[in-house]
Amino acid sequence: MKDYENNCYIFILNLAKELAQDYDIQYQHMEEFVRWNLPEEIAIEWIDAEGMVAILECGKCIPEETVEILREIINAFILEFEKIDNPVWTHESMNRSAFWDMQRLNARRLLDKMKE
């Protein structure tokens, strides 16, 4: 099995978990999305990170210390990821997903507001 420690997907998962600790909003569609789009071995971890969606979708003020983490998440989603060796993974579906397009757009808007 491939070592995932340096994989950018795991990097994002870990950052999202950090963010999720401060938010308790539950998003049912997050669980549905990950079960269809992530490899089974990391889907469970991702489901625990619904706070990432809460931060990107809600209108709450983002703490200054969170801005850099959000920026890294956005940059990671934009980059051409190294695909993991798992036939279940469908990076293209994530790339083309309206759900993730909206998360990227919301995150950009929130970061722009922080700069004003």
What does each of the following model-derived ranges do?
Residues A49-L105:
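Amphipathic protein-protein interaction modules
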Residues Y9-K17, R71-I74, W100, R104, ...:
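Generic structural concept
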